[in-house]
Amino acid sequence: MKFYYLDGHLPVRILGEELDSFIIEKSNKTLEFVEKNRVSEEPASFGNQLGFIKLPKSFEPKFGEDYFRASEDLTKAIKVTYNDSKYERLRVSFGLCFQTEVEALAYLAALEFAERFKPTN
């Protein structure tokens, strides 16, 4: 299965091609027409991989620095100021901190795709 990256980070699947646009499927199953120049084969930054999906490079914030991560319920990206707590250090060590909101959203989209396409036994 091949994934492409919308706006440099968000994983999508290409379902069709028009003259100047692609028909893409997002992780939430919505279809959209987007200009071809917004879709790339590789993400703008690459850190880890989740199945076939390349995740953005994680960010290691310093004390008092802002970063983005997934909310506790994994429904949205939230902006957080790094406070050096035990939980924040765990997030950093597991690569769950991102410099931009779109990178955090890309991580959430990757989780959503992985859940949809996980192998069934």
Task: Report the location of each language-model feature.
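Structural boundary micro-motifs
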Residues: M1-N121
